[in-house]
């Protein structure tokens, strides 16, 4: 087990004996505002020089506060300069402070730590930082995006520093294995800090689905946790479709798949739903909760956004605190009068649990500033805004006691911090204790009493070679055997569950063995076609038509390349937004004769991005039809559809064609040659003679005869191994390469097929047989 790290960017171990600002200097009355603002902004330097923009405009602060100074300073901040109209200056920069008020660039540091992108097509933004105590290093993250649609998407990037001056890739980092080995000497406490010396922690094909990453380290579970705002490939105008996801990592470099969190934000004072834009999350041991300040908004974009407070006992399930904002824009003419932006905080413990102080560094914008005189950090109008300064970006400070803050947010003058609730028991349960190999199952974890304060759970497996369990409590069956899944909390509650891993009776049918059709489609490419559900890409979707709108119910059908005995169906909803996620459904098995039977139905699918798995009694089918009875917004969508056969999949038989010109064919009687591009290999034969025949001997298990139908044609008898197997009527509308006869399921061995004309005309194009 690795050494445990001390408090990193949880920012909860700080012991401060005096406020950073005297109470008289803080501008707001706590009876009206949850936080008291300092009268001016703080001076954060910006590296750029631009004749169209005022100097030192900055945003996206993230502040790390340590118990003891690190390389001379207890306060370290990562942030980005920013100006209106262009994003090329929005590159992560570093400052440090001894008091959280006066910020300096450490001697020898050259900002920004990440160079300006080569063109306006790309931009950096949304910085965050965490202290790694085990390695005694700072880890600075930021978001990078290719703003060109159809480009390479986005990345969460990382630079690391041992001294706060040189930021880059540690010399002990192996790029091939993505392993950062712990340095054991001063010579190893070095980084390569060139222009391209960064680590890509996460990459995505979408441009804006990992905005404002905020990272903490959990010393109890020995994991890093990242939350980010998913706005898909849209960004600023994605509106209420935004949502927050979280991931885990053992080392802060390689991250797991994201899981969407629940209830991150609620309603504002006007009853409108809030959507996230930027966030800062920390775990506060004093409260035994994850706490987040979220820059959020009601409406279509973040203009005029505010801060709200939201909390969680486990990091997954959240609850907004009241409906009042934590921080709002100031009065007209103030430096923060337009919009509160990405902000950072720490909770300073008080003399007792819940009696601490909330300290917030917040970025904000001042509006309508073009060519006007604007205030400096002391409040004096000494700065000339420039021609493209539609708004000015600054970073300021606000604070309040935690209790007073909560009294305002909850509109409860008598609020006191509730006492922490000790748990009596932790209980694990699962829908079954028998898990097939390759399958996953989510544990249910409950507490008594239900309001137990400490609900951060560490899961472990007694035998990861049999079954693994991740930080979300999701078990994966690895191999046949038995494993005990254990759960525990910081305060010592625990439980375990024995899981038997058995052979998996289901086999995934490859999507390449299926085709998809739908009763309604929108005419887009990444949003619309039924084929999108079989492309292996959850970011492309089938969508019912909405221009004009086709009312539900509507269906999407997957057809198989051969009959399968199927017993499981998986519906993967769209991953960005909820519009069209199916909530009520019917599932039909389609048989070879075209009939269909209902095999499953339901009306309780959640409007989230999680897979919906349906198991049903095994049935032989040539396809499955998913009928959307109800869906969000009255539409139907699907990102992916997958079907599982019950039992092993027999490979599709391989048919070998035998053309009419093949020397192994034996023709008797009069046969005429015919040429046409619609025939197999361009040729066929036909006979007008009753009794004329064609014969073929093969070794295999199945045989097919292909030829023409025509309104002037008659009939033939087909013999297999000398026994009449059927009479075939070839009369019908003219059509080439028609399957006229099929015999399958033959015992493997030598067989002979013979076609005899009994009523002219009879056509022969080719045989096709299954050999070895």
Swiss-Prot record:
Q: Where is this region: CBM32 carbohydrate-binding domain?
A: 502-765
Required co-factor(s) are: a divalent metal cation
**Acetylation found in the keyword field:** no
Q: Which UniProt keywords apply?
A: Glycosidase, Hydrolase, Metal-binding, Signal
- Uses in biotechnology: 5 ug/ml of this enzyme pair converts A blood type to O blood type in an hour, and can be removed by centrifugation, showing the pair can be used for production of universal type donor blood.
F5/8 type C domain: from which residue to which, for each copy?
494-605
Q: Which Pfam families match?
A: Big_2 (PF02368), F5_F8_type_C (PF00754)
How activity is controlled: the entry says:
Inhibited by EDTA.
Signal peptide region:
1-27
Described by its record, this protein's role is as follows:
One of an enzyme pair that work together to convert the A antigen to the H antigen of the O blood type, which together release galactosamine. Catalyzes the first step in the conversion, generating the substrate for the subsequent enzyme (FpGalNase, AC P0DTR5). Works on many different A antigen subtypes. Glu-90 probably activates a nucleophilic water molecule to start the deacetylation reaction.
Q: What is this protein called?
A: A type blood N-acetyl-alpha-D-galactosamine deacetylase
């Amino acid at each position: 087990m690795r050494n445990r790290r001390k408090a990193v960017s949880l920012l909860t171990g700080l012991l401060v004996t005096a406020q950073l600002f005297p109470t008289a200097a803080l501008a707001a009355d706590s009876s009206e505002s949850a936080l008291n603002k300092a009268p001016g902004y703080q001076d954060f330097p910006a590296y750029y020089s631009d004749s169209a923009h005022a100097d030192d405009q900055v945003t996206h602060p993230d502040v790390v506060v340590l118990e003891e100074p690190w390389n001379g300073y207890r306060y370290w901040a990562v942030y980005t300069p920013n100006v209106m109209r262009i994003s090329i200056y929005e590159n992560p920069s570093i400052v440090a402070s001894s008091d959280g008020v006066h910020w300096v660039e450490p001697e020898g540091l050259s900002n920004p730590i990440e160079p300006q992108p080569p063109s306006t097509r790309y931009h950096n933004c949304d910085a965050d930082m965490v202290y790694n105590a085990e390695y005694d290093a700072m880890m600075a993250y930021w978001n990078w995006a290719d703003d060109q649609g159809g480009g390479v998407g986005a990345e969460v990037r990382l630079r690391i520093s041992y001294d706060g001056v040189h930021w880059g890739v540690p010399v002990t980092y192996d790029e091939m294995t993505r392993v950062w080995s712990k340095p054991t000497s001063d010579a190893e406490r070095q980084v390569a800090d060139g222009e391209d010396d960064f680590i890509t922690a996460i990459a995505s094909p979408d441009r804006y689905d990992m905005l404002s990453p905020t990272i903490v380290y959990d010393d109890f579970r020995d994991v890093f946790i990242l939350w980010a705002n998913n706005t898909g490939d849209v960004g600023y105008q994605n509106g209420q479709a935004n949502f927050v996801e979280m991931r885990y990592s053992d080392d802060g470099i390689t991250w797991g798949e994201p899981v969407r969190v629940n209830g991150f934000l609620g309603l504002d004072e006007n009853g409108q739903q809030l959507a996230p834009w930027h966030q800062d999350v920390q775990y506060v041991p004093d409260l035994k909760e994850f706490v987040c300040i979220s820059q959020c908004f009601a409406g279509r974009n973040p203009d005029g956004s505010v801060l709200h407070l939201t909390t969680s006992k486990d990091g997954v399930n959240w609850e907004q605190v009241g409906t009042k904002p934590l921080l709002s824009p100031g009065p007209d003419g103030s430096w923060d009068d337009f919009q509160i932006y990405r902000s950072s905080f720490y909770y300073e413990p008080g003399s007792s649990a819940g009696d601490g102080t909330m300290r917030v560094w917040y970025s904000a914008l001042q509006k309508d500033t073009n060519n006007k005189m604007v205030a400096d950090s002391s409040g004096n109008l000494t700065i000339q805004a420039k021609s493209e300064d539609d708004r000015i970006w600054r970073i300021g400070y606000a604070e309040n006691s935690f209790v007073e803050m909560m009294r305002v947010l909850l509109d409860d003058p008598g609020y006191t911090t509730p006492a922490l609730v000790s748990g009596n028991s932790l209980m694990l349960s699962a829908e079954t204790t028998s898990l097939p190999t390759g399958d996953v199952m989510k544990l249910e974890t409950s507490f008594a009493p239900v309001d137990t304060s400490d609900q951060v759970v560490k899961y472990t497996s007694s035998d990861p070679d049999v079954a693994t369990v991740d930080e979300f409590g999701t078990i994966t069956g690895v191999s046949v055997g038995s494993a005990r899944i254990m759960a525990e909390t910081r305060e010592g509650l625990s439980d375990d569950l024995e899981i038997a891993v058995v052979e998996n009776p289901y086999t995934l049918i490859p999507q390449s063995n299926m085709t998809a059709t739908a009763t309604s489609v929108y005419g887009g490419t990444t949003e619309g076609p039924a084929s999108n559900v079989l492309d292996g890409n959850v970011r492309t979707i089938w969508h019912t038509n909405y221009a004009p709108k086709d009312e539900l119910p509507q269906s999407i059908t997957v057809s198989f390349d051969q009959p399968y005995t199927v017993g499981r169906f998986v519906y993967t909803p769209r991953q960005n937004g909820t519009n069209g996620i199916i909530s009520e459904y019917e599932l039909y098995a389609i048989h070879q004769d075209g009939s269909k039977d209902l095999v499953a139905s339901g009306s309780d699918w959640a409007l989230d991005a999680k897979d919906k798995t349906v198991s049903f009694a095994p049935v032989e089918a040539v396809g499955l039809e998913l009928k959307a009875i109800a869906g969000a917004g009255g539409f139907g969508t699907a990102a992916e559809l997958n079907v599982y056969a019950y039992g092993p999949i027999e490979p599709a038989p391989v048919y070998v064609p035998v053309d009419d010109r093949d020397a192994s064919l034996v023709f008797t009687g009069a046969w005429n040659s015919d040429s046409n591009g619609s025939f197999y290999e361009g040729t066929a034969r036909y006979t007008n003679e009753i009794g004329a025949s064609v014969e073929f001997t093969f070794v295999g298990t199945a045989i097919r005869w292909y030829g023409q139908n025509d309104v002037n044609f008659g009939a033939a008898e087909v013999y297999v191994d000398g026994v009449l197997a059927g009479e075939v009527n070839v009369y019908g509308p003219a059509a080439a390469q028609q399957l006229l006869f099929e015999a399958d399921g033959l015992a493997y061995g030598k067989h002979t097929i013979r076609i005899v004309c009994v009523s002219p005309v009879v056509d022969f194009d080719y045989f096709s047989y299954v050999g070895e």
